[in-house]
Amino acid sequence: MQLDEQRLRFRDAMASLSAAVNIITTEGDAGQCGITATAVCSVTDTPPSLMVCINANSAMNPVFQGNGKLCVNVLNHEQELMARHFAGMTGMAMEERFSLSCWQKGPLAQPVLKGSLASLEGEIRDVQAIGTHLVYLVEIKNIILSAEGHGLIYFKRRFHPVMLEMEAAI
């Protein structure tokens, strides 16, 4: 199997891996930016840490690294449009995205998306280059949780709501 064919088959396989949709944000001396990401996972709870993967070609990497902090906003099922904005699917400029009234500052001064299922602010502890992506290891310092809302996942290259299972009628 040729490398390009294997790469495409791998991408197709990963499209079958349901993943939570997140908007990763940062703000500081290096600027303000955000990106939609599904390559996010927990690493450990002691200390609370996450792994965030961003394409190495993204112009946002110097901003994330320069600020040294970020916020992972776990989207709810009603925030698909925001996911599309931050994925660059709508043509909305970065400045416009952050001018919407749905943002507030967290204790680490990072952009926190109101209504997210969870917003996790943290400090970037390490960045590793692996293939086409940079892997950010982030130590979480602040967590905001919401009891409201259902999940939003990306599956088969499309957004899908994940509703809480209803109790079966007896």
From Swiss-Prot:
Pathway: Aromatic compound metabolism; 4-hydroxyphenylacetate degradation; pyruvate and succinate semialdehyde from 4-hydroxyphenylacetate: step 1/7. Its EC number is 1.5.1.36. Keywords: Aromatic hydrocarbons catabolism, Flavoprotein, FMN, NAD, Oxidoreductase. It is an enzyme of class 1 (oxidoreductase). The keyword Translocase does not apply. It catalyses: a reduced flavin + NAD(+) = an oxidized flavin + NADH + 2 H(+). GO terms for biological process: benzene-containing compound metabolic process; pyrimidine nucleobase catabolic process. It holds the Pfam family Flavin_Reduct. InterPro entries: Flavin_Rdtase-like_dom, HPA_mOase_red, NADH-dep_flavin_reductase, Split_barrel_FMN-bd. Catalyzes the reduction of free flavins (FMN, FAD and riboflavin) by NADH. Subsequently, the reduced flavins diffuse to the large HpaB component or to other electron acceptors such as cytochrome c and Fe(3+) ion. Homodimer. 4-HPA 3-monooxygenase consists of a reductase component HpaC and an oxygenase component HpaB. NCBIfam families: HpaC, PRK15486.1. This is 4-hydroxyphenylacetate 3-monooxygenase reductase component. It comes from Escherichia coli. The gene is hpaC.
